[in-house]
Amino acid sequence: MLGIKLIEGEYDTHNWLEAVRGYEKEPEKGARCAICFDRRFEITAQKADELGEKSFSSTLLTSPKKSLKQLKHAGDALGKKFDIVFEAPDYRKASGTQEQNILAKQDQLYRQDYCGCLFGLTMQREDQQKLADELFSPISKQIQPESIEARLELYQKRWDYEDEGIAYKIVKERFLNWRQEFGYVKVKKEVIPSHFLPYSTLKKRYSRGKIDTQIANLHYMNRDEVKFITLKTYNHLAKTNYATVKELIFNSPSFEIELKIRNQIINNGYDLSCIITVDNIPTSKLEIHFQSHIYEDVKEVMLKIT
């Protein structure tokens, strides 16, 4: 679109984590940021020098979460090392940040509200008393609502619409989001494969009891509103053919399909009972270790204009 070639550098997570070891609790604009700038700018300056460029810069200069003085200090030092100029205009002065917001909204661009560092994000979400759901990554690789993967999917669709000349509008929706932190079931002190459906919750992180009632294909535990279904029932409702629950755990269908399964099992959109899929229904006492999060959230939705 701009005619500028994008050169992607190595996403060197391991070495970055080693470099900032001991600085995990540093605040935004602190020593950890300085270490990060030095590493990033050295790679950028080196590449600019290789390409024969006379100057380099950084999009971090537009971020209200970063120190302009700190950025300029790091950039100038690396520029001197490679004998090139670090361009550091103050994009924020004269209401520059507000202008950025206006333009981003006008052009329907995604605007990230954190710097991208997992330590900075964690502290920011703690201050906001919000779940850092950007750091959740299901072992099933399922794309969950308002996850980074969901945003990538949305904006890829946006590019498709742009290429096809389809008119669209990106709007925001407030909704109830959910994330599973961990979950497993024990029978006779042995962990059995188990899969928890979306919007499953448990009052505490631990429950134990026995399944004492079956109505149709739904099996009820005698405590904490917990319910079980067999893999056979799951396959029937999802129109899938998983051979084992373990296979299901590592390769779940889409979040939307699992929501439909839940709604078929319990015809109540407000129900937050824990619903667990197992290979076979346990006949002896069992233990459940489970933690999930239910929280208000906002997501972007793309609407086709006809």
Where are these regions (language model features)?
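ATP-dependent adenylation/nucleotidyltransferase module used to activate substrates
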Residues: 1-60, 64-75, 81-89
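Generic structural hydrophobic/aromatic packing signal, biased to beta-strands
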Residues: 6, 44, 75, 86, ...
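Charged, low-complexity, helix-prone segments enriched in Lys/Glu/Asp/Gln
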Residues: 19, 37-41, 72, 94-104, ...
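A polyampholytic, Gly/Pro-enriched intrinsically disordered region
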Residues: 26-34, 104-120
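Short flexible/disordered coil segments
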Residues: 38-42, 66-82, 114-131, 150-165
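C-terminal cap of thioredoxin/glutaredoxin-like
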Residues: 68-106, 121-124, 132-146
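Long, charge-rich C-terminal accessory regions
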Residues: 122-277
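Long mid-to-C-terminal assembly/interaction modules of large eukaryotic proteins
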Residues: 270-306
